Amino acid sequence: MVEAIVSFGVEKLWDRLTQEYEQFQGVEDRIAELKSNLNLLKSFLKDAEAKKNTSQMVRHCVEEIKEIVYDTENMIETFILKEAARKRSGIIRRITKLTCIKVHRWEFASDIGGISKRISKVIQDMHSFGVQQMISDGSQSSHLLQEREREMRQTFSRGYESDFVGLEVNVKKLVGYLVEEDDIQIVSVTGMGGLGKTTLARQVFNHEDVKHQFDRLAWVCVSQEFTRKNVWQMILQNLTSRETKDEILQMEEAELHDELFQLLETSKSLIVFDDIWKEEDWGLINPIFPPKKGWKVLITSRTETIAMHGNRRYVNFKPECLTILESWILFQRIAMPRVDESEFKVDKEMEMMGKQMIKYCGGLPLAVKVLGGLLAAKYTFHDWKRLSENIGCHIVGRTDFSDGNNSSVYHVLSLSFEELPSYLKHCFLYLAHFPEDHNIKVEKLSYCWAAEGILEPRHYHGQTIRDVGESYIEELVRRNMVIAERDVTTLRFEACHLHDMMREVCLLKAKEENFVQIASILPPTANSQYPGTSRRFVSQNPTTLHVSRDINNPKLQSLLIVWENRRKSWKLLGSSFIRLELLRVLDLYKAKFEGRNLPSGIGKLIHLRYLNLDLARVSRLPSSLGNLRLLIYLDINVCTKSLFVPNCLMGMHELRYLRLPFNTSKEIKLGLCNLVNLETLENFSTENSSLEDLRGMVSLRTLTIGLFKHISKETLFASILGMRHLENLSIRTPDGSSKFKRIMEDGIVLDAIHLKQLNLRLYMPKLPDEQHFPSHLTSISLDGCCLVEDPLPILEKLLELKEVRLDFRAFCGKRMVSSDGGFPQLHRLYIWGLAEWEEWIVEEGSMPRLHTLTIWNCQKLKQLPDGLRFIYSIKDLDMDKKWKEILSEGGEEYYKVQHIPSVKFEKDYK
């Protein structure tokens, strides 16, 4: 609902006015009036959100409030920034500008007055058109829809599922938990909407083994808005005789509790709670359960941790989506009429098209059923082809805002969206920026959220922007709205994506809320522009973008280019940006600039917080870049041999992420000592900056250092000594340079107690002993070290290591040995470009958890170790093409890898 999103914006604006109140000397009365009006808006939005009204008039009022909030926020921030700029100017200049200051404040007061008038008009319109009554009416209809849905779920608890496909194994497993596992009392079935959780629970509920095991059975659908008393009444009615129904309805809550507690204590009962939404809902219900073990509970929910806290006798079961084959079987039952009992009537061409369409369902049973229903009454190839052309919208089934189809994919999945807190609604809608199947990087996403004010200050508590953003992703994953897995080495969510059906809902919601304007194809003519009033604009895979011609919204706050072609760049034209002074996010990944220069007009974007020029084709940055004092994210790792960077970064005190160019002229000097809030600093070079500048950066989590002139190890380690939060350290030197070989003789700084990832690209013929490495190291990468001795006997004693990379000439010897008991946690091993390596011995008992093994471009290695046969955990093996003949089925070494599910031969370095 847009009300929740706008309400979030009003709250942020209110907080800003409160925090910056001392800045508004001379206009205090106007600010007080504005805060009073904001209070009125907050009350209205709170009411509209709580009652979930969907009328067009209410939406119109809310949209107008949203525009007012955006404009007010921009106006206030512009005033504060200009005031700060004046304070930084010299005394003489200040004296000469006193008159200008008075004029500026008068203009600001006038602007506030204009905003207040707009608020008053919205409030007047709400009274004139009876908006408050519409909200109340909408609340009643929303409640009726919820009640109807609850009744449907309750009615079908004992129904037979004619379209039950692919769940037999799951039913057996769940029945086992309930019937055979005495130590398990609570079983939850969790997953995204439409996955078939309720269908699965029905099969378990009606299973003969379950009926035989339990004396009493109860099925209770828990609506989103329920009372504890009502739920307890339904449980008692289910568990007792029908004659007591009226008596139960007369009971008070305390009496219900006592009756249920005693009943569950003295009988073997199973209670199914279908569709619990919140952990606190379960907390309200569960006081009726006694400590004794006779009872069991089966829960269905979209939230994975619904009954987890404080309960050791709990197991969560997460069904997987249907396979393509299972989806096809389910689809046939619904879409294709039978010729006889064993055969479906279907044209071969239609079958091929049907199989293509079900792929779009992503294995979601509800989506497959909806698709089957849509095609059941369509009998020609032409009908099927026409539907396939816009399959996403057809399956999701979104109509207008008053859509009452409770079984549509849109309705089922959008319930999860409506249940989100306001800030997470923003986060979810932001994912509409990205194309289908795009791997969304969580770190960059977190900084975009922070730049737009979506990350709430109350969630920081000393955490980094990345930490807070990741906690939001974790919450969306827990609610089964986003798909992401933690990286085994970092234990972080590195990337995420959406299920195809959830993405369709995300796009539709974003369109409803006018959240972002998505451009996949540029306007066909030079005179056409992208219409629309959204404050966010994303262009997906453009070949050319002419900013001043193609974008006509001066209130734009976010401009993102999502570019997925790794080999080519796209052209950026008309890039003065002067008309887009309110931008907060600007992502120009792989842009090719006119004249290879970043325009000086970039300095006018004083609101900018996020600027990404990663792999852009630009040779020179303007000194006006220093005006961007609100930047928290700056990536200038451009795709040119040498980038001119003016010494203008010192004033960017808010920077949290700075990625410098990999190659910069040694004449360029950059002062960085003021950037004490940095959390990530990449491509720092001793050729362009002083190691002394690092000493104040105590908040760094990630640091990449390039050593290009003689530096003692004492000087280097003294610079990073105070970085007690450092997790990821990379050190590189010029290729083959031996003057830094003593840097690592005694190992890395032991004071770096949180260091988890270490990347060394330097000449280092001897590896330090294992005691000279941080004890919690999970990942190490060695590149160009020219190690003479086998590194594995040392590395395998680092007990927390989960990833090892040996890159080009990391080891120059001939023989490596992996010992029994070595690398107990290792998950991934990458070996590339070891030109002299001939033999690898793997003892039985080595690397017991290895999942991925990659060996490329090791020309002298003639055979894989026999010990690979004993590593049963390996799932992926990736080799050069030259190995294909001997490792494929029938090959002389196939017996060593036949237990590995995925063996690939992708590269050839001959």
Swiss-Prot record:
Disulfide bond entries: none
Coiled-coil residues: 15-57
NB-ARC domain residues: 148-460
Positions of LRR repeats: 580-604, 605-628
A Pfam family per the record: LRR_14
Sample GO molecular function, one term: ADP binding
Binding site for ATP: 191-198
Family (UniProt): Belongs to the disease resistance NB-LRR family.
Protein name: Putative disease resistance protein At1g58400
Species of provenance: Arabidopsis thaliana
Species lineage: Eukaryota, Viridiplantae, Streptophyta, Embryophyta, Tracheophyta
